[in-house]
Amino acid sequence: MLDKLGQNLSEALNKIKNATFVDKKLVKEVIKDIQKALIQSDVNVKLVFNMSKEIERKAIEEAPPKGFSKKEHIIKIVYDELVKLLGENPQKLELDPSKKSVILLVGIQGSGKTTSSAKLARYIQKKGMKPALIAADIYRPAAYQQLKQLSEKINVPLFGDETKTKTPVEIVKEGIEKLKKSDVLIIDTAGRHKEEESLLEEMKQMKEITNPNEIILVIDGTLGQQAKNQAKAFKDAVSEIGSILVTKLDGSAKGGGALSAVAEINAPIKFIGTGEGVDNLETFDPKKFISRLLGMGDLDSLLEKTEDVMDESTEESIDSILKGKFTLVELYAQLETISKMGPMKQIMGMIPGFGGNMPKEAAQLTEQKLKRYKIMMDSMTMEEKENPELIKTSRLQRIAKGAGVKQDEIKDLLKYYATTKNAFGNLKRGKMPKMGGKMGQIMRQLMYKE
């Protein structure tokens, strides 16, 4: 898995961080560790070798810039070279809100295309636009039903032919006509291989009918280096492929290989799938990606994620916190927000110093604890939530019984509440920079000691 790659790279760099003296021998030892970590993640050996030579040359020959120590300079060199390996400059999906846009998703069967269609619709929906889905895959059993379930989950219109009596081209034509009120049409096409001439011809027809703003190739991250051949085959067949979406990176030991292989053919990776949920789609930024991989965090993405999941009740609770009020009501609202943000391990990876260092078991334990805390608070009266100091022996017994937990767990919750309240105690309106909104104020206050 990618967190294993992150752990191995972090351990290699720790040898530099913890060293009393950095010499040529240590640099070579660290480079060897980096090589091993990348090759285990299925990154092309030639790419790894060329990158290693560049790291060694710069680490030995270059003098650190003013204000940088030798250690910091070497870590920066490694960071820069890893970013280069993945394509350097991020490229975003550009959509004009004033015009109707069409996105065509193509890829091999089993790459995760249908799920990615729904994820992309959800991503666009969160940007304030009105997406709609067209199910044009009539060949895979249950493809329409799968997309229908996902579209209902995110409340996005869907057009398709459950009877499979129409051709994909007919479905797309009719779908465009029926979904006129939508800003962005996302078309889920049938999975295909480069040798399937009829399917490639079908895709070309769809392209002519829809005149898509972007054709996105969906690639399975578990393919590792083989992703390069697949991406190249599609790029040769359909020269207008605008970008790549790499899926299944959360559970692949070959994710690094897939990303570097695709980057090698100069096909821009715009999105990566980081989990099974409809919200587990991220724009791909090589700098942020490597930063998180090395445990340096990614606060900008974390703040964006918190803003995405905030609703009216969260806003109200944040207003209360910023005014100095913090009860179990506010705590509950914050736990709700954290739960919506995604897997705990992914969230912790965005916080500097954590990266891939949070054990899977610890992340699962934390997620379970958050759920249990919410169940315990559901067993409390509003009076108890607003005045936690009222919770003494008899109330403790009643709450524990109602939640189906031990009294010690209620005490653990109250202790967590007291600690959190203390952390929020120093918050004063206007004290923190406004970047990231109200939630940004709170998160920055908690992450940095002043």
From Swiss-Prot:
Q: Where does GTP bind?
A: 107-114, 188-192, 247-250
Domain notes for this protein:
Composed of three domains: the N-terminal N domain, which is responsible for interactions with the ribosome, the central G domain, which binds GTP, and the C-terminal M domain, which binds the RNA and the signal sequence of the RNC.
The name on file for this protein is Signal recognition particle 54 kDa protein
Please explain the role this protein plays, according to its UniProt record.
Involved in targeting and insertion of nascent membrane proteins into the cytoplasmic membrane. Binds to the hydrophobic signal sequence of the ribosome-nascent chain (RNC) as it emerges from the ribosomes. The SRP-RNC complex is then targeted to the cytoplasmic membrane where it interacts with the SRP receptor FtsY.
The record's subcellular location field reads:
Cytoplasm
Q: Which organism is it from?
A: Methanococcus vannielii (strain ATCC 35089 / DSM 1224 / JCM 13029 / OCM 148 / SB)
What InterPro entries does the entry give? Answer: AAA+_ATPase, P-loop_NTPase, Signal_recog_part_SRP54_M_sf, Signal_recog_particl_SRP54_hlx, Signal_recog_particle_SRP54_M, SRP/SRP_N, SRP54, SRP54_GTPase_dom
- The EC number(s) attached to this protein equal 3.6.5.4
Q: What is its EC class?
A: hydrolase
Key word Hydrolase present: yes
HAMAP family named in the record = SRP54
- Write out the entry's keywords from A to Z: Cytoplasm, GTP-binding, Hydrolase, Nucleotide-binding, Ribonucleoprotein, RNA-binding, Signal recognition particle
Please indicate if the UniProt record lists Hydrolase as a keyword. Answer: yes
